[in-house]
Amino acid sequence: MKEKNQVVPDEVLSKEFLSQFKTEADVSKFLKQLHAQVLEKMLEGEMDAHLGYEKNSVTGNNTGNSRNGSYPKKIQTEHGESVISIPRDRNGQFEPIAVPKHESRGLSIEKLVISLYAKGMSVSDIEEEMREIYEIELSTSAISIITNKVNQAAQEWQNRPLGPVYLIVWMDGIVFKVRDNGKIINKTVYLCVGLKQNGLKEVLGMWVGKSESSSFWMGVLTDLKARGVQDILITCTDNLNGFTDTIRSIFPQSSTQICVVHQIRNSCKYVVYKDKKEFTADMKNIYNAPNKEVAATELDNLEKKWGGKYPYAILSWRNNWDDLTVFFQFPLEIRKIIYTTNLIENLNGKIRKYTKSKLSFPSDDAVKKTVYLSLMEIEKKWTMPISNWGLIMNQFMLMFENRIQI
C-alpha cells in the first residue's frame, strides 16, 4: 500500500476548515499567510535563543538586553510577496538566520545549516539548534554532509580568477590551533586583501601554513600571479625578513610599506606598561609627520628621550626606516589608507568573532572551511567604497597613470 504523505493530520483538515477554500487562489492565499506566520514564529524562537529567555519572562529582568519591538520586511516566496515582522533587540545585536538581513528569501534547510556553521557553531550545536528552535530533526551525519559541501565552494573561491591590477594589497595572518599528526599545534591562516579600482575591498585568498617565511609568501604571490594579477601598486606587510625582496621578485614595480601598526606593537614589546602610553604618543609624532624629513627628526627625538631606557624599541625603527616610510611618497589621503586603515587587524577580529566557539580544529580543511564561511559573511557588508574615493582614485591615477587602466 502506498504510504500517505501527511504533513497535516486529517483531524485538522475538517470539513469546517476546508469550507473556507472555494478556489485554488484561496488555497494559495492561505499558504502565503501560513508561510509568513511560520517564519515569524521561527524568528521569535531565534530571538528567545539570542536573549536566553522567552517573551514576557521575568528571567529576562536586568539581563542587559531585551526585545525592542519589530520592523516590517518584504520577502519573496513561491506564493508571492509577503510582509513579515522581524523582531529586534535593544542592543541591536540580533542577527536573524531564517530570514537573513539584506536578503528577501528565507533560507532552505541546507542554507540554514551552513549559516549556523558560519556563525561558529559545531555540528552537535547545530543539531540541537535545529531541533529546539526550528523543530527539525537532522542527524549529525546529515549536517556534516551539508557542511562538507562548503569545501568545494571554498576551493572554487580560492582558485577563482582575479583582476589584473590592485591598488593596495594587505598581507597578514591569523593563528588557530589545529590538530596535526595527533598533536594540537599553532597554524596560521594567511590572508591577502586587495583594494580594487572601484574603492571596494576583496579578500584575494587564504593559505594555511605552520610558519611564516619568505619562501611561503613566494608561493602565495606566485599563486596570485597565476590567477591573473599582473600588478600591485602598493603592498602592506609585516616586518618579515626578506619579504620585500620576495614581493619585488614577483611584482617588481610594487612599493612595499611595512605595517606601522605591527611596528608600533613590536616596539611596545620592549617598553614597560607604565611608559607605554607616553611612548606610543611620542611614536605617533613619527608617522603623523608631514614628510619623511620631519619624521626622521621625530625619530631622533624619540631616541633622545627613550633610547637610553629602551634601545631595542628604537632599533627596529632604525633598521626598517626606508620600508616604514614609503607612505611619505604619497598624498595624505593615500597615506591614511596605507598606515591608519588597520584593515587586516579589523578583518582578523571579525573572523575571531565567528570562530570564538572553536577551541581547536580537527584538520586544515576544517579551519579553511570555517574561515571561508566567515569571510563570505564579512564580505557581504563590504558594499561601499573607501571614504573620499573619488579624490583618492584621482591621486592614484596621477601617480600611476601608466599602470592603471580605466
Question: Can you say where each PLM-predicted feature lies in the sequence?
Answer:
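Short, amphipathic alpha-helical "recognition" segments used to contact nucleic acids or chromatin
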Residues: S108-G120
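Short, conserved DNA-binding cores of transcription-related domains
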Residues: M1-P100
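DNA-recognition alpha helix
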Residues: S124-E135
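RNase H-like nuclease fold core
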Residues: T63, P87-R90, A98-E103, I136, ...
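Alpha-helix N-cap/N′ positions at the starts of helices
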Residues: R105-I109, E278
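Conserved beta-strand -> loop -> alpha-helix junction used to position metal-binding or nucleic-acid-contacting
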Residues: I234-N241, T246-K284
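Acidic/histidine-rich catalytic cores and adjacent linkers
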Residues: E3, P252, N285-I406
